[in-house]
């Protein structure tokens, strides 16, 4: 049994707290006083995990130092736009003998950096920084539905985190040394998931969904290889695994956003209707689109979602344009 500190009390942060508290001492940093009072008295937050009672052994705090101090493993689980601030907040308290894990699936909307790159640019010292990702709806994982994820980072440390945080038979962790690939797969699948929601909203059928997932994976692979990631990672849990579950399920915020876009709504209105809960694909779309444009990477689905989100492109016209592109080989390049 070790001490685990979790920075962030959204759906995924609370789900991880519920899982890891079965084996370890878990302390969760909560951003707002109102959420802290709710969680510390009722051990639930239906805005994120509806009808799920959290383990009473979980400790909640509004003091970030209290969550970080004495924690062998510190896990940041915030939206990507708040990740840099989370790193700034924990920097005075975290030390080289601790392990930092990012469980945020996104890219920095201003710089396009992965979360581990953001962390390394802010936190001084030489501590190990890893990434946790994979097909994992918070609502299911918190209930104990069998879930498998991957932790990416240096070999010895990722193996230690794998062995320490796995909670059989509910939560299985694999490890990978391709941290960049693990991060990219987890971030870019959110873009394709928005498209998946549009497909669902328009009731286009299984043929269209299969084509989207397959061609979407091609785009993720092109992007990942340009960043130095390994292609085999894209065929693992953080790649195709997360892509399938996020594109196919209404539990995904990104998928739900796409369904609402198909009704003619603007993404800002959808986020407001959902208590401000973030669809990470919005930020990932901006970062990936701009990177692809600068580096001449062929990502037509990403470009289409960018134009729908930010240029008010007509969805039916955009779909017609995608399906009318010049014929080409099926290969990645």
UniProtKB/Swiss-Prot annotation:
What InterPro entries does the annotation carry? 6-PGluconate_DH-like_C_sf, 6PGD_dom2, G3P_DH_NAD-dep, G3P_DH_NAD-dep_C, G3P_DH_NAD-dep_N, NAD(P)-bd_dom_sf
The EC number of this protein is 1.1.1.94
Active site residues according to the UniProt entry: 189
GO CC term (a single one): cytosol
Keyword vocabulary terms for this entry: Cytoplasm, Lipid biosynthesis, Lipid metabolism, NAD, NADP, Nucleotide-binding, Oxidoreductase, Phospholipid biosynthesis, Phospholipid metabolism
Q: Which annotated residues bind sn-glycerol 3-phosphate? A: 105, 134, 136, 189, 242, 252-254
Catalyzed reactions: sn-glycerol 3-phosphate + NAD(+) = dihydroxyacetone phosphate + NADH + H(+); sn-glycerol 3-phosphate + NADP(+) = dihydroxyacetone phosphate + NADPH + H(+)
Task: Write out the pathway annotation from the protein's UniProt entry.
Answer: Membrane lipid metabolism; glycerophospholipid metabolism
- Protein name in UniProt: Glycerol-3-phosphate dehydrogenase [NAD(P)+]
Give the species this sequence originates from.
Brachyspira hyodysenteriae (strain ATCC 49526 / WA1)
């Amino acid at each position: 049994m070790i001490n685990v500190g979790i920075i962030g009390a959204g759906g995924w942060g609370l789900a991880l707290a519920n899982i890891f508290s079965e084996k370890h001492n878990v302390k969760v940093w909560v951003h707002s006083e109102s959420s802290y009072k709710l969680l510390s008295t009722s051990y639930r937050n239906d805005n994120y995990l509806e009808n799920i009672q959290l383990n009473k052994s979980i400790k909640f705090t509004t003091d970030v130092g209290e969550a970080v101090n004495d924690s062998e493993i510190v896990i940041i689980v915030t939206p990507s736009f708040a990740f840099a601030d989370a790193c700034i907040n924990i920097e005075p308290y975290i030390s080289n003998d601790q392990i930092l894990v990012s469980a945020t699936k996104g890219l920095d909307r201003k710089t396009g950096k992965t979360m581990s790159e953001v962390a390394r640019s802010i936190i001084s010292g030489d501590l190990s920084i890893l990434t946790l990702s994979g097909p994992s709806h918070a609502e299911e994982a918190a209930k104990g539905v069998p879930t498998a994820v991957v932790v990416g980072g240096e070999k010895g440390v990722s193996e230690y985190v794998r062995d320490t945080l796995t909670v059989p038979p509910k939560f299985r962790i694999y490890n990978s040394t391709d941290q960049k690939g693990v991060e990219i797969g987890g971030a870019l699948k959110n873009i394709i998931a928005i498209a998946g929601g549009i497909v669902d909203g328009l009731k286009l059928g299984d043929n269209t969904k299969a084509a989207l997932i397959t061609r979407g994976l091609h785009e993720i692979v092109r992007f990942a290889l340009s960043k130095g990631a390994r292609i085999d990672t894209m065929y693992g849990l953080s790649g195709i695994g997360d892509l399938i579950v996020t594109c196919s399920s209404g539990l995904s915020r990104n998928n739900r956003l796409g369904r609402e876009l198909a009704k003619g709504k603007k993404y800002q209105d959808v986020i407001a209707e959902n208590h401000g809960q973030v669809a990470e694909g919005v930020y990932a779309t901006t970062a990936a689109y701009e990177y692809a444009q600068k580096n001449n990477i062929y990502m037509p689905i990403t470009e289409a979602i960018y134009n729908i989100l930010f240029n008010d492109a007509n969805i039916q016209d955009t779909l017609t344009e995608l399906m009318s592109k010049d014929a080409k080989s099926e290969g990645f390049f």
